Amino acid sequence: MKNKRVLAKITALVVLLGVFFVLPSNISQLYADYEVVHDTFEVNFDGWCNLGVDTYLTAVENEGNNGTRGMMVINRSSASDGAYSEKGFYLDGGVEYKYSVFVKHNGTGTETFKLSVSYLDSETEEENKEVIATKDVVAGEWTEISAKYKAPKTAVNITLSITTDSTVDFIFDDVTITRKGMAEANTVYAANAVLKDMYANYFRVGSVLNSGTVNNSSIKALILREFNSITCENEMKPDATLVQSGSTNTNIRVSLNRAASILNFCAQNNIAVRGHTLVWHSQTPQWFFKDNFQDNGNWVSQSVMDQRLESYIKNMFAEIQRQYPSLNLYAYDVVNEAVSDDANRTRYYGGAREPGYGNGRSPWVQIYGDNKFIEKAFTYARKYAPANCKLYYNDYNEYWDHKRDCIASICANLYNKGLLDGVGMQSHINADMNGFSGIQNYKAALQKYINIGCDVQITELDISTENGKFSLQQQADKYKAVFQAAVDINRTSSKGKVTAVCVWGPNDANTWLGSQNAPLLFNANNQPKPAYNAVASIIPQSEWGDGNNPAGGGGGGKPEEPDANGYYYHDTFEGSVGQWTARGPAEVLLSGRTAYKGSESLLVRNRTAAWNGAQRALNPRTFVPGNTYCFSVVASFIEGASSTTFCMKLQYVDGSGTQRYDTIDMKTVGPNQWVHLYNPQYRIPSDATDMYVYVETADDTINFYIDEAIGAVAGTVIEGPAPQPTQPPVLLGDVNGDGTINSTDLTMLKRSVLRAITLTDDAKARADVDKNGSINSTDVLLLSRYLLRVIDKFPVAENPSSSFKYESAVQYRPAPDSYLNPCPQAGRIVKETYTGINGTKSLNVYLPYGYDPNKKYNIFYLMHGGGENENTIFSNDVKLQNILDHAIMNGELEPLIVVTPTFNGGNCTAQNFYQEFRQNVIPFVESKYSTYAESTTPQGIAASRMHRGFGGFSMGGLTTWYVMVNCLDYVAYFMPLSGDYWYGNSPQDKANSIAEAINRSGLSKREYFVFAATGSDHIAYANMNPQIEAMKALPHFDYTSDFSKGNFYFLVAPGATHWWGYVRHYIYDALPYFFHE
């Protein structure tokens, strides 16, 4: 890369000297021969712009002079179109410079190039332009054009341009401007230190440049010394960047020409830039909102404005990246001044300005009807902004109470959705410590915004003396109070930080308020004022840092840090609902009727559906998708049901834009009891955006309460309410419930049978000693025999034999085509996260339509194939959920739970997944969902094995065989699909290994069932069929699909290959045969 040699180096030397002492007046010149400008274009556009509205500049790699990077000029409409660059900062009138540039074109023949200088005469205020060199250039050859030229002494804003006599495309490179003799030193009088270093460990200190001040060498030297953030005063506003010609609804043209010299200065000198601004009711041309991009057109529709807004924001960020990729664009005011000063409008209209154009009215409100455009703008900005660019809402009078509260409400909503990083406080105030913009109101507003959790930047600070009404010392006191407030926030806040304090102008001669109001830190001669010295007195020297590398980059956007308990948030609902809001038409409010801790909890009422609950947005900077966290809340209800199931879930939008709902925890509880919803190891899906944690009930609309809501570091131990004592097991025969079985119980039973007394429900359960569902003389006889010790236990009536209509030779039968469409009685998929022997992993749980946690369900675990994951089976490609929904709705399949785990992750493989299945998956799933497992102890799981199945496709079929061999004590039904058992060297070895596992289990042939399937043209058929034949020969299997008579079947689909489009139908054919024995 070529070395950039610019005047900034000499300026930096002078500035460095200025840090330590005031340059004596007799030292006014440095003797040197030097390059004033050397533009190489190796990284940035170096301040060069298109000359001509349709002309396009682009950097071309390896096509510049000497095979480096150069600048190509294309799409010229006239000979006057070309390229230009403002060089006013580097060049002075009355001084002779040598100008040089290398050019090349690939046209035909010879092209005449022109090198021109234009300038503004500071006395006559006339624009002048002179061609200083012409040269005929042969096609395909790099040629130098050079000339010496001295502009008049009154010349300012000197600009260099390159054109030709035609509209041919051309390339230019290596622009140099040199001078002989003596370089004028920039004398900048300084205090004893510089602001950017003093505050480097707290925040950036910024200032403003515009098209005039950027050409003032004294101001730029001051900027280089004192500040590490720059905002373009007007040059990046919409009227400066929007290009009317050639714009379409989906491609808004933008230009950085007016900002180019400022952006180039910042890029060359590593000064960070605040972008200002994208969306504003003011200084945005009217045509941008009108049909055909004409001022007199009709207002466009919202949908069209959405397109224009997105394109404008997208193209602005893209153009900055294209022209100045090295620029540190650390912050951007996405929306500016959208909230009205009118208290009536902040109270009743969400702060929206009056609709219209001009005089403070908003064309954005004219089109959208309210302030909904704000969220749209931030959504687009978040989509297209560089990752390190923080997004801000910026406004004035931001300390006025009604406006402050409206701004805070808007920004909290945006922040909670992960769209906004901070609030910009413009801070145009006066030197009065009291009154409307007094320091107490100002600090209250600053704290209000910090309490959102976001960062704050003081973006346009100036403190007016109001033409001498306030003294310079009063101004100094106010400046110190503002800076001190920002420092105090950063020293104490556990939430947001102040990441920049930017003054709105370099000196009192360059301020929008007029020099008579003297609102800035330096006077008109760049001398530090008392305000500067006051600000410089706050930070002790021991805390100074490197202003060129401020702490955290000064850009903000850090995630919240957990407190000493590991909590990111802890909502106690004592006096505040915090950031919790209602879902749907529900209402959330504080209540003192009941509380788990303290005196208040959050009441959720006026619910019309089960999903109407309470929610809290999660900040993605803190709760990072893909990472694991702890979530906890306690919940209770008082009346309206005998029991309810509380669910704590995550609502989010996935990578495809689909809204998803994932269960964090769910538990059932009775009235007047608190239940702990708690998952210390919940992994947020990696593609999650727009996240909310919420609490609802499973299937009722009762009022309920929550308390002690916590989001914390993964693994945090949070104690909840003690588990409610469980009912003791029913002691059959103990009719009166006194814990013993004696003649008193027999007497009560007889009197009940004779209808002399009526038993309670609990007594009936104990009196029904044969458990056949009725109380009769058989129970009397059995209890009598038990008391006489004829029997030592009560015989339990056998379950009736299955009424399922088996077929003895099932054939491949695809599900009806309609089953691939969504079902009106759709179940739901819940993504769960658990931590086991192979780390933190996810699985999906299918719950049938009308899932009732008070009922018991059979459960089927279904494994994916190689190269797939837990999401494959329930994806839109496989559509298995639709098939299950239809089959259940039409009575072809009993409602059941289906779980799709994964053998990916950690040290897990398809062969050893059974270990994780036993130790982690079954206990995790069946402790959360209602299956036949009375407990998730090994004994409880084993006791419910006849209600549990396992299957898998391809490599998942391999997993199924390994589960069978190693988990027969836990699983009774197996569905290996298109996968054989990888064991031994022959089909007989495989069959014998399976037989040995059965022998070890001690199970009878009526206690395990295998329904295998594949396609005749599937590659797995060649390996599966010999294994199946060897198994059929074993005495352990009776081959038939009628599981009332046998326990083994192999379904072969004619012509079917390796495709889920077939496999889903295998499941449809086989699954109805499970769980009837």
Curated annotation (Swiss-Prot):
Gene3D superfamilies, sorted: alpha/beta hydrolase (3.40.50.1820), Dockerin domain (1.10.1330.10), Galactose-binding domain-like (2.60.120.260), Glycosidases (3.20.20.80)
Pfam families in alphabetical order: CBM_4_9, Dockerin_1, Esterase, Glyco_hydro_10
Entry EC number(s): 3.2.1.8
pH dependency: Optimum pH is 6.8.
Gene Ontology MF annotations: endo-1,4-beta-xylanase activity
Keywords noted in UniProt: Carbohydrate metabolism, Glycosidase, Hydrolase, Polysaccharide degradation, Repeat, Signal, Xylan degradation
Domain named Dockerin: residues: 728-796
Signal peptide: 1-26
Catalytic activity from the UniProt record: Endohydrolysis of (1->4)-beta-D-xylosidic linkages in xylans
Temperature dependence as stated in the record: Optimum temperature is 75 degrees Celsius.
Active site, UniProt feature: 337, 460
An annotated GO cellular component: cellulosome
Residue ranges, annotated region (Disordered): 543-563
Alphabetical list of PROSITE patterns matching this protein: CLOS_CELLULOSOME_RPT, DOCKERIN, EF_HAND_1, GH10_1, GH10_2
GO process annotations (BP): xylan catabolic process
Domain CBM-cenC: from-to ranges: 33-180, 565-714
Residue ranges of domain GH10 in the record: 189-538
Family statement: Belongs to the glycosyl hydrolase 10 (cellulase F) family.
Descriptive protein name: Endo-1,4-beta-xylanase Y
Species the sequence originates in: Acetivibrio thermocellus (Hungateiclostridium thermocellum)
Lineage: Bacteria, Bacillati, Bacillota, Clostridia, Eubacteriales
Gene behind the chain: xynY
